Amino acid sequence: MSGPTWLPPKQPEPSRLPQGRSLPRGALGPPTAHGATLQPHPRVNFCPLPPEHCYQPPGVPEDRGPTWVGSHGTPQRLQGLPPDRGIIRPGSLDAEIDSLTSMLADLDGGRSHAPRRPDRQAFEAPPPHAYRGGSLKPSGGAVPTPMLPASHYGGPTPASYATASTPAGPAFPVQVKVAQPVRGCGLPRRGASQASGPLPGPHFPLTGRGEVWGAGYRSHREPGPGVPEGPSGVHIPAGGGRGGGHEPQGPLGQPPEEELERLTKKLVHDMSHPPSGEYFGRCGGCGEDVVGDGAGVVALDRVFHIGCFVCSTCRAQLRGQHFYAVERRAYCESCYVATLEKCSTCSEPILDRILRAMGKAYHPGCFTCVVCHRGLDGIPFTVDATSQIHCIEDFHRKFAPRCSVCGGAIMPEPGQEETVRIVALDRSFHIGCYKCEECGLLLSSEGECQGCYPLDGHILCKACSAWRIQELSATVTTDC
């Protein structure tokens, strides 16, 4: 894109408007087929706008009525102009000014009767219209009213912009008049403010619903520190630079704002009422705050006041004392011991490991044999009819049957669990004691060749039994 070409002044040729179009005061002329020319005013110097600086909104028909720039920099459509006025001449300038002033008053007066919110009133601005190039032709001291971008802070602020593709040309001082609100807008009337400076570069006015009427009539403010300024050669449109400018402002009093306000009040209250000392948490006994150094103790993964950390049974304070925790409850030593099981042998509380047998609790050292007093922890045992505890050996020695020959207890063999004994003539015998009383022959319990042949209460083998029988028979014969 090439920069504008500045031609020397020539004899001005009257430019003509198309049929049915009128040029209001201060508006740009219609486009021409040749390069843009400049007709200097005897009192005011003008800087022409190059054709590439004019913005044509997409989708907007070209045949629109003239526009004027409000105090927000928002283009407003002027209604009611005659369709065919011809070229504006210096002689009709005063009448044109009066007509425009009357139309503006009617528009603003009609707007003031519309229902609005008590705090702010929103309106929709019609889309702007811009001519594509042309010549500036001020007449009769008329001052053009440029289209200024909507400002974030309400006040009109003319600024100079240099696009990246167009070199900055010579600056011509220009008096720029900013349109001010008239009566009927619900705001105090103010005088027109003036500012000197070069004409602004291309801009894109905000025409969305997010613009609020009356927001731009605040006092002139300096830009806040949180609003960045655009770099030279780059124009940031109003509304944060988002496309289209449709960014409606959120209504007041939404839940996030209420939540933020509540949290802020809570923070202010907490800061206004600080604790008197260091805060350690809530007491596990009474639920109150534990504040101050030395005011609490930590136990059972909780914080307690000194007076709240007591025994669950006798309510004695446990600070600096040994305590026992049972199911997240603290006990002093005496109360804890009272809750323990007692040994069935010595009747003392069991503080260490518990050994249970036959439904009773024992100290491991108290669970012993009543005969040999050997500890039976992990060793097989048995009990008698009176529930006395015996080891297996002592139980057999005490309660096993006795051998009729040796008189010893008949017990299981080492490594065996069963007891083997021989019963004959209602007497019990060890296997090794079951012998013939005459010859000492080891008898067998099977009843075969070396079986027992009892005779007159004696245990005899077969031979000895026969000899005894013959001897008795001879004696009987002799007696006869």
Curated annotation (Swiss-Prot):
Tissue: Highly expressed in kidney, stomach, lung, heart and testis. Low expression levels in brain, colon, thymus, pancreas and skin. Not expressed in skeletal muscle.
SUPFAM superfamilies: Glucocorticoid receptor-like (DNA-binding domain)
Domain LIM zinc-binding: 281-339, 341-401, 404-471
InterPro entries in the record: Znf_LIM
Region of interest (Disordered), ranges: 1-43, 57-84, 107-134, 218-257
Membrane-traversing stretches: none
Posttranslational modification: Phosphorylation at Tyr-55 by SRC is required for enhancement of lysophosphatidic acid-induced cell migration. Tyr-55 is dephosphorylated by PTPN13.
Residue positions where Omega-N-methylarginine is found in the record: 25, 111, 183, 190, 209, 242
GO biological process: cell adhesion; chordate embryonic development; positive regulation of cell migration; positive regulation of non-canonical NF-kappaB signal transduction
UniProt GO molecular function: interleukin-1 receptor binding; kinase binding; metal ion binding
Phosphoserine: modified positions: 92, 193
Keyword Chloroplast: no
SMART domains (UniProt xref): LIM
A Pfam family per the record: LIM
UniProt biased composition (Gly residues): 238-247
Intracellular or extracellular location(s): Cytoplasm, Cytoskeleton; Cell junction, Focal adhesion; Nucleus; Cytoplasm
Function: Relays signals from the cell surface to the nucleus to weaken adherens junction and promote actin cytoskeleton reorganization and cell invasiveness. Involved in lysophosphatidic acid-induced cell adhesion and migration. Acts as a transcriptional coactivator for NF-kappa-B and JUN, and mediates the transrepression of these transcription factors induced by glucocorticoid receptor.
Subunit note: Specifically interacts with the ligand binding domain of the thyroid receptor (TR) in the presence of thyroid hormone. Interacts (via the third LIM domain and C-terminus) with PTPN13 (via the second PDZ domain). Interacts (via the second LIM domain or via the third LIM domain plus C-terminus) with PDLIM4 (via PDZ domain). Found in a complex with PTPN13 and PDLIM4. Interacts with SVIL isoform 2. Interacts with LPAR2 but not other LPA receptors. Interacts with PRKAA2. Interacts with MAGI1. Interacts with SCRIB. In case of infection, interacts with S.typhimurium protein sseI.
Annotated protein name in UniProt: Thyroid receptor-interacting protein 6
Organism for this UniProt entry: Mus musculus
